[in-house]
Amino acid sequence: MAVPKRKTSPSKRGMRRSADALKAPTYIEDKNSGELRRPHHIDLKTGMYRGRQVLTPKENA
């Protein structure tokens, strides 16, 4: 069975756990519509991505 040779210091333990925190998602304001959207994602209301029409937006009935 594997056993650690040395005790893990609180500093090393904290550095290992520093990546475990949940981060709030970032949003940017769309240039055309002014809506908030995730970076590198399609704007679902307009269907635009990087200035090109990628999807046809759904019309709410």
Swiss-Prot record:
Span of the signal peptide: none
Protein keywords: Ribonucleoprotein, Ribosomal protein
Region (Disordered): 1-39
Name of a matching Pfam family: Ribosomal_L32p
Sequence ranges of Basic residues compositional bias: 1-16
Stretches with biased composition (Basic and acidic residues): 28-39
An individual GO BP term: translation
Gene Ontology molecular function: any one: structural constituent of ribosome
CC terms in the record's Gene Ontology section: large ribosomal subunit
Family, similarity comment: Belongs to the bacterial ribosomal protein bL32 family.
Name this protein carries in UniProt: Large ribosomal subunit protein bL32
Top-level taxonomy: Bacteria, Pseudomonadati, Pseudomonadota, Alphaproteobacteria, Hyphomicrobiales
